[in-house]
């Protein structure tokens, strides 16, 4: 795992190189995805079935067989071990409670002319959620995508999840039942995104697609944007852990927080930033100790080698500057007084405050969404939320008397834009 210091002459270029990562602009990938989308768009069910058999070796012989019944979801939930069922319910309850606070309501006000202005908030009609599949799948992703949609008032939530060789993690199905997902199709990849975007004879077209996936899913979401809305183009997951070498810090905790990200994927990114050279050394040692016995050590080791970094900064100000430059998906502030740093953080997907708040809690059960902007997009993007499943319409009502002064203003401006019909339309209201 490489080490950098802000005092290095080439620090800026080294950091830029580490942060540079793009998987969805590969020409071959884009050509493949465009071909899949075109085939699904024109071939419908038969192409979806063919590609699912080809890529996932799914045993289904009809597209209808790719859909799971609500009874199957309920059975998966009922058969859960009591401890696991309780944990899933706890997570779902907390996610729902948090997201209920995000609901936006319609509002109106009357201006000084007696005109009524406002904003109408409406839930989307139908959304599609993509959930990574197989045995190593993530029921938490079901909760984080479906629950905000339901809280927003979405009428129908369609879930797609790949099932290699027809095999699915029962916990994913149980989560779909708990989150009140309306329909579940065992399809994945670019073909699933295309089916959701354009619809087939069996799979209904949706208004928006959310949820993480591999590079083919990300490229497909980018390609269908405009036909449907999307939440974001998700890149590899990342964490930045910040500490200052305080007495209460534990190097083994910090190391494990970094490794919890690195074990996700060989292209995941774990970054440690500290003001203490001694702490940097201690964390490096603890990482090596943990790698000796972690089940996914091979994945974590590759991740740390390829994209991990330990960064030494001179002071807190430099630390905050590095954080805002990285704009991490997950940011842990492992310090005594994290609130003192909050106003200095401008760019981060989720901020984990204090050393008793590891990213892992946020991933599963804290309540805020774990679908977060990656690859520096926290500079301009937000976590998935209820607001992603609601849209807004402006409300404008002008009374007869209130219309006249506004029409005069519109008339003048329209003339200066050389739009005569606009000007006359306004003029008719006051002459």
Curated annotation (Swiss-Prot):
Pathway linked to the protein: Amino-acid biosynthesis; L-histidine biosynthesis; L-histidine from 5-phospho-alpha-D-ribose 1-diphosphate: step 9/9
Cofactor note: Binds 1 zinc ion per subunit.
EC number: 1.1.1.23
Functional note: Catalyzes the sequential NAD-dependent oxidations of L-histidinol to L-histidinaldehyde and then to L-histidine.
Residues reported to bind substrate: 237, 261, 264, 330, 363, 417, 422
Keywords for the protein's UniProt record, in alphabetical order: Amino-acid biosynthesis, Histidine biosynthesis, Metal-binding, NAD, Oxidoreductase, Zinc
Record has Transport as a keyword: no
GO terms for MF: histidinol dehydrogenase activity; NAD binding; zinc ion binding
Gene Ontology cellular-component terms listed: cytosol
Organism: Psychrobacter arcticus (strain DSM 17307 / VKM B-2377 / 273-4)
Active site: 329 (proton acceptor), 330 (proton acceptor)
Reaction equations catalysed: L-histidinol + 2 NAD(+) + H2O = L-histidine + 2 NADH + 3 H(+)
Residues binding Zn(2+): 261, 264, 363, 422
Cofactor dependency: Zn(2+)
The protein, known as: Histidinol dehydrogenase
InterPro entries the record matches: Ald_DH/histidinol_DH (IPR016161), Histidinol_DH_CS (IPR001692), Histidinol_DH_monofunct (IPR022695), Hstdl_DH (IPR012131)
Protein family: Belongs to the histidinol dehydrogenase family.
CDD domains named among the record's database cross-references: Histidinol_dh
GO BP: any one term: L-histidine biosynthetic process
Annotated residues for binding of NAD(+): 130, 191, 214
EC class of the enzyme, as a word: oxidoreductase
SUPFAM superfamilies tied to this protein: ALDH-like
